[in-house]
Structures are given as C-alpha cells and as structure tokens.
Amino acid sequence: GISESSKSVRELFGKSAGVNILAAARIFMFGARDVWFVVGLPVFLYSAGWDFWEVGGFLAVWTIAYGGIQAVAPSLVSRSTDGLSREVPAARVWAIFLTVIPALLVAGLQTGAVLPVPPATVVVAGLMVFAIPFAVNSSLHSYLILAYAGSKKAAEDVGFYYAANAAGRLTGTLLSGLLYQSG
C-alpha cells in the first residue's frame, strides 16, 4: 500500500522515542567526527610535515577501513529475536568506546614529555582505533532505525534519520571551518 506522510512539522518530528534518540545520536556522532575530520585533521597532518598524498592517502585508508569494519559489524553484535533486546544495549556499549577512545587519544597527546612519540603518530593510531567503534555504532544504528521505524511510515522514519545524519555532517563541517578560521 501507499504510506501516509506527516501532515505537519510537529507530526514529522513527533517520532517514536527510539527514532528520535537514534536521530539525535546520529547528529552528534557525525557532527563530532566531522568537526575535526573535515578541516582540523588535514591541517594538523600538514603542520606535522605530511604532504598532500600522505594526508589524502590516510583519509582514504581510514574511510576504506571504516567501510570494511561496517561490513563485518553485524558479526560483532549478537542478534535477538525481537531485534532490540541485545542490539540496544550493544549500541550503548559501543557508544562508551566512542567516548573513551578520544579521551585516551587526548591523554596520549599529553604524555609527549614522558613518551617520545610524535603527536601525529598518536593521532593516526588513535583514529585508526576510533574507526572500529565508530563504524560498528554507525552500522548498528542503521539496523536499529529499521527496527524502530513504524510500519505505516517506515520510509519517513528512515528519511528523518538520514536527514539527521546529513544535519550532523553539515554542522560538523561548518564548525570545523569556523574553528579553523578562528585560529
């Protein structure tokens, strides 16, 4: 059959709690990544002496690794018959890794006086490790949106979720440029 679209903005944003939480998580997840990944990381790597091909090569390798991890992500999360009882707690655990790894990366950068490791090495290693929970969380969220989407408005719920993804990326990109401009 034909699904019915939302009749008002309030109805469009009045999704189920699960859809709204996933959309908010998507905004923050991709916004937080892109705020440093779009401008800050390339500028940092250039300032560390990397050339165009090395910076572009790292970004390409990171993106390809991220895609590869997403491909195997379903095997890293046990499935439940209802599609939510194991998957939602797993998303929470993977979200903790998304918080802890950047904190460890910052701590690693602060130990420069103790451990003679170049900051670029710490950042690159940290980002490669960060790709794992980021990709698993992204994949898991993409699964969960389908589990949470209402049958009558599934396409609208999924579209709302991916619009939130785009909003997060746009926000992160704009903030990345703003931070660069502000010095």
Role assignments for model-derived ranges:
Residues 69-87, 180:
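Helix-to-loop junctions at the C-terminal end of transmembrane segments
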Residues 1-15:
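Flexible cytoplasmic inter-helical loops of multi-pass small-molecule transporters
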Residues 52-53, 149-161:
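Loop-to-transmembrane helix entry/capping segments in MFS-fold secondary transporters
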Residues 60-64, 159-167:
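Transmembrane alpha-helical cores of Major Facilitator Superfamily
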Residues 1, 178-183:
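A membrane-interface helix-boundary motif in multi-pass transporters
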Residues 136-149:
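Intracellular juxtamembrane helix-capping segments at the cytosolic ends
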Residues 88-138:
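C-terminal transmembrane helical hairpin of 12-TM major facilitator-type secondary transporters
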Residues 18-60:
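Helix-loop boundary and gating motifs at the non-cytosolic
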